[in-house]
């Protein structure tokens, strides 16, 4: 476990509340949650299924709007921003890793990792160099030109992790990023993920059920009664 970063704020949640309607009932998944993640800090989110981990990550990544409270990305409040600006923040500052890869089937592994860079205006040459480097770090140098349908489930997930890191995001949000990998592969891939995040000075909030993986991060939080608390 590393010393907690004292860098600038990468993500801050203030009074974050999320309610859903279920028939005649209103379910409050998050209830005034408070949290701060600083640049260079990697935090594990460990909590049972159904407690709101995925909802929290969607709110933090500006994929959903809270019922109340505010999300700050790099000290910029997201409330009141247009959809266009929120999309630009997600594209330029945030990387997402989901448990299921969501790769584009008509593009090769290398092209899938290049694509977010090209959308952000990176030259094709630099985008390809970055994609080849990241895929190589995750053991996929021999799979650069393979379509997702020709990759194993583990290879698809590693490609998705490389894609999430492609634009050197300042904030990485990951939901069980190695949950579909075997134990040996998960250990290697997670170690490489941590190395890339630390080398590039990013901040990361990573949901995991794996206590051993959580112990390799700077600190661990959990969800209790709709609030984020130390684990």
From Swiss-Prot:
GO terms for cellular component: plasma membrane. InterPro entries: AAA+_ATPase, ABC_transporter-like_ATP-bd, ABC_transpr_LolD-like, MacB-like_ATP-bd, P-loop_NTPase. It holds the Pfam family ABC_tran. SUPFAM superfamilies: P-loop containing nucleoside triphosphate hydrolases. GO terms for molecular function: ATP binding; ATP hydrolysis activity; transmembrane transporter activity. It is found in: Cell inner membrane. Its EC number is 7.6.2.-. Keywords: ATP-binding, Cell inner membrane, Cell membrane, Membrane, Nucleotide-binding, Translocase, Transport. It is a peripheral membrane protein. Coiled coil: none annotated. Its main location: membrane. ATP binds at residues 47-54. One of its GO terms (biological process) is protein localization to outer membrane. Disulfide bonds: none annotated. Residues 11-231 form the ABC transporter domain. Part of the ABC transporter complex LolCDE involved in the translocation of mature outer membrane-directed lipoproteins, from the inner membrane to the periplasmic chaperone, LolA. Responsible for the formation of the LolA-lipoprotein complex in an ATP-dependent manner. The complex is composed of two ATP-binding proteins (LolD) and two transmembrane proteins (LolC and LolE). PANTHER family: IMPORT ATP-BINDING PROTEIN, LIPOPROTEIN-RELEASING SYSTEM ATP-BINDING PROTEIN LOLD. Belongs to the ABC transporter superfamily. Lipoprotein translocase (TC 3.A.1.125) family. This is Lipoprotein-releasing system ATP-binding protein LolD. It comes from Gluconobacter oxydans (strain 621H).
